[in-house]
């Protein structure tokens, strides 16, 4: 065990437009090479596209609904017991749930075919809010993997 003190968690400031802390965190996930202004433009552009396509809905509410649809409840972790490696299902703590959801959302948005990243992100957000899309499929795959390895749940960490 390291003897050094654990670094204190830095407070994340709310994003300037919507005043949401979770959206500010999401912008940090979208950001590449420290270019925060570009990340902000992408995220706000995606939310404007979502608002234009789904009139009458608050884009921030839809964003949070999409994150909930993507966030996994359980995942598997490898545990080595007597020469065999077992995939042990474990519950995901809330902070990791959000982090995984954001990471998957950005990763699968980058793999989409639309022209700009803002349009890709908007498309993935709309799909996730409706319960479809690649990010939601990833969550279902993770849940299926945990369900298949339920027999090893007594090897908890």
From Swiss-Prot:
Record-stated family: Belongs to the universal ribosomal protein uS7 family.
Ranges in coiled-coil conformation: none
Gene transcribed to yield this protein: rpsG
Gene Ontology terms describing biological process: translation
Keywords attached to this entry: Ribonucleoprotein, Ribosomal protein, RNA-binding, rRNA-binding, tRNA-binding
Subunit structure: Part of the 30S ribosomal subunit. Contacts proteins S9 and S11.
Protein function: One of the primary rRNA binding proteins, it binds directly to 16S rRNA where it nucleates assembly of the head domain of the 30S subunit. Is located at the subunit interface close to the decoding center, probably blocks exit of the E-site tRNA.
CDD domains in the record: uS7_Bacteria
Domain of life according to the entry: Bacteria
Name used for this protein in its record: Small ribosomal subunit protein uS7
UniProt xrefs under InterPro entries: Ribosomal_uS7, Ribosomal_uS7_bac/org-type, Ribosomal_uS7_CS, Ribosomal_uS7_dom, Ribosomal_uS7_dom_sf
Pfam families to which the protein is assigned, alphabetical: Ribosomal_S7
GO CC entries: small ribosomal subunit
Molecular function terms from GO: rRNA binding; structural constituent of ribosome; tRNA binding
